[in-house]
Amino acid sequence: MFSNQYIQQRIHKANSLREEGKNPYKNGLKRSLTNAAFLEKYAYVKGLEEPKDKEKCESVVGRVKLLRLMGKACFIKIEDESAILQAYVSQNELNDEFKSLKKHLEVGDIVLVKGFPFATKTGELSIHALEFHILSKTIVPLPEKFHGLSDIELRYRQRYLDLIVNPGVKDVFKKRSLIVSSVRKFFEMEGFLEVETPMMHPIPGGANARPFITYHNALEIERYLRIAPELYLKRLIVGGFEAVFEINRNFRNEGMDHSHNPEFTMIEFYWAYHTYEDLIELSKRLFDYLLKTLNLDSKIIYNDMEVDFNQTSVISYLDALETIGGISKGILEKEDRLLAYLLEQGIKVEPNLTHGKLLAEAFDHFVEHKLINPTFVTEYPIEISPLARRNDSNPNIADRFELFIAGKEIANGFSELNDPLDQLERFKNQVAEKEKGDEEAQYMDEDYVWALAHEMPPTAGQGIGIDRLVMLLTGAKSIKDVILFPAMRPVKNDFNVEGEE
């Protein structure tokens, strides 16, 4: 692993420090200010004419990002999480320690500098070192400074390196943290209670997806990593909670692309005595709050598309297929004609798909990617909505919506099915679909039906994909860009180091 010549040179320098009686992995020294706080506190120091006050001594830390040696002095750029700060180190101040520094210090090392503020000839606020300590000696060179880390695959596999050399990446994940905390704060302000439900389920449910399977040794039974928390959250509504939410991971054993990762973060929330129309209004308020919190305009650019949050619309599923997808009602209303149409368009579909699933295929191919401004699509076919409430005036459609922005599904919500007999029949239909080969059809969950039999009040529930939400609000083009450690195919890592900084 460490046979590379550049690594061996650094290991030799670490050992050389030990021979001088210095621990290359020192502990216990503390900074007095972050780099950003130093720059703010001493911003009044403008030039060399400013008196140098050695009594104003501070300690700062960071990773060496740039090193310029000039005989008996050197300039060092050090970076902590807050900012980059320049340090000036001279032999006049450090004496023999300066010789050790010149011998051992390299880009990538973690250091502590203790000194006073001053400004260079160019007016750059810096710290004039009185003490200098190597806290952690790097033994692997960073990627070449002018080109950074551009290999996409390597960036995802070695995210720690990506964060070191690409400053914008860290900004994305700071913004992700702000988005998640803002979503949490919004729901708390709306009166929702945050809860936690199981991550391992005896029966996978809450969504149509293929689960990951694990084994519980103590119980000697299989368990499933959850594909959604929905059925547990609705059990809480049965139990008397009226507004709950959970922000956590879901797992779906399916394909990966630029908008899908098998392990992803969602918020799901359930609201007793409300309907899906109330959720639409709540979603609008949520986005208004997020745009304000993130200081974003109502118009944002995503993937070269202008998304205008002031142009939010609501349209029914069939109307979207007709007016946006360009498919006539005569075709949409007849299962055989719709199947023939899809095949004519070159779309591969199974001949035994139900009418509702054929409509879903048509929607995915002809409508979804065209929904740029926030669009709430309502009145979904009941066949593809096994947990949603039937519409009172048309039992073939569900009181359900999905929110699409920039051509992607962002949220799914509906008035919840709370009729236990209807739910039991829907589960039976799902089991029949599974027996026909539909691996994503839902399992029978009699325990959940029994919970519903104790009656759940009229309730509306919704899920929002946090990762896609972060993509939208940060402009990220791939879901891997907003997940710190995305799923990757295993490879044998040769830990190759191609060159020195």
From Swiss-Prot:
Q: How many and how are cofactors bound here? A: Binds 3 Mg(2+) ions per subunit.
**Which GO molecular function, any one, fits this protein according to its record?**
lysine-tRNA ligase activity
**Main localization of the protein described in the UniProt heading:** cytoplasm
- PROSITE patterns from the entry? AA_TRNA_LIGASE_II
Quickly give the catalysed reaction.
Answer: tRNA(Lys) + L-lysine + ATP = L-lysyl-tRNA(Lys) + AMP + diphosphate
Q: Keyword Metal-binding, does the record have it?
A: yes
Q: Which UniProt keywords apply?
A: Aminoacyl-tRNA synthetase, ATP-binding, Cytoplasm, Ligase, Magnesium, Metal-binding, Nucleotide-binding, Protein biosynthesis
Q: Provide the binding site for Mg(2+) 2.
A: 409
What HAMAP family does the annotation carry? Lys_tRNA_synth_class2 (MF_00252)
Q: What is this protein called?
A: Lysine--tRNA ligase
Q: What organism is listed for this UniProt entry? A: Helicobacter pylori (strain J99 / ATCC 700824) (Campylobacter pylori J99)
- Gene that encodes the chain: lysS
